[in-house]
């Protein structure tokens, strides 16, 4: 989030930086330069969003490449690699605005998970329940936010699994439950879209970015 200084210099004021980076991005950048521990990340500007929308919902020349360059910087800062099962980097894509709009912004968590990365993460954490719960969250959010699948369709699967397992809350579901839920979520995406859930982490990030732009 080191781009906040450049944004402030470019726009000539903190208010201008907030307009360019959004309140969330600007505040994270400000905390970073103050030395507050903030996980590495980057902000895609509102100007990039406007150019995308103005160009017929296509990335302007060089914008996607700049996003990938920023992602490489996060890899360098964390010692992890996007899509690498041995050292997996997971990222979130969040929308933002100049002013706070609780409940109105889109979020896709755990981008970078796929079948291979999930197995690698299980080997690293020895916690398959955590991994498959994280994986199903990605598939559910991606399906809802990016692909337009009604969220209640996913929630119905979780409810049915709780009933079948004889438990009342999600926290009582086992790793095998979340693994099966993830599989069913992928089936839902294929049914609604005619396409499989994307296993390529960079494609996940690109599609998530486009969804947040829209």
Model-predicted segments: where are they?
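Nucleotide/phosphate-binding sheet-loop regions of phosphoryl- and nucleotidyl-transfer enzymes
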Residues: 1-214
